[in-house]
């Protein structure tokens, strides 16, 4: 099994994801090859919380051109992790 820190790349902080935190839903950018079970285990191990469910979205790379060179940006995978009602919250901004 991979190291949990290799699976969870970073939290995604936007206005929409900050509104979801009130519902105990946290959004992370994860490794492209990770599946729902690996994401669940990684979040539980890193943050010490209980995960109820995981929703995953795949994003393909966008086509970009710079002068005569063209190519695609990197693929991404985003995971929305829902915690159980009795689980503690994840501290994204430590004081």
UniProtKB/Swiss-Prot annotation:
PROSITE patterns: RIBOSOMAL_L23 (PS00050)
Family annotation (Gene3D superfamilies): 3.30.70.330
Entry's family note: Belongs to the universal ribosomal protein uL23 family.
NCBIfam families: PRK05738.2-4
Record text on subunit structure and interactions: Contacts protein L29, and trigger factor when it is bound to the ribosome. Part of the 50S ribosomal subunit.
A GO biological process held by the record: translation
Domain of life of the source: Bacteria
One GO cellular component term: ribonucleoprotein complex
PANTHER family: 60S RIBOSOMAL PROTEIN L23A
GO molecular function per UniProt: rRNA binding; structural constituent of ribosome
Protein source organism: Geobacillus stearothermophilus (Bacillus stearothermophilus)
InterPro entries: Nucleotide-bd_a/b_plait_sf, Ribosomal_uL23-like, Ribosomal_uL23/eL15/eS24_sf, Ribosomal_uL23_CS
Transmembrane parts of this sequence: none
Pfam families on file: Ribosomal_L23
The protein's role, per its UniProt record: One of the early assembly proteins it binds 23S rRNA. One of the proteins that surrounds the polypeptide exit tunnel on the outside of the ribosome. Forms the main docking site for trigger factor binding to the ribosome.
UniProt keywords, alphabetically: Ribonucleoprotein, Ribosomal protein, RNA-binding, rRNA-binding
Protein name: Large ribosomal subunit protein uL23
């Amino acid at each position: 099994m991979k190291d949990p820190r290799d699976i969870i790349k970073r939290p995604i902080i936007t206005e929409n994801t900050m509104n979801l935190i009130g519902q105990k839903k946290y959004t992370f950018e994860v490794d492209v090859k990770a599946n729902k079970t690996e994401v669940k285990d990684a979040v539980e191990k890193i943050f010490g919380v209980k995960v109820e469910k995981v929703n995953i979205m795949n994003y393909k790379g966008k086509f970009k051109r710079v002068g005569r060179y063209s190519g695609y940006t990197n693929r991404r995978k985003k995971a929305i992790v829902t915690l159980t009602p009795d689980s503690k919250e994840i501290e994204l901004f430590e004081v």
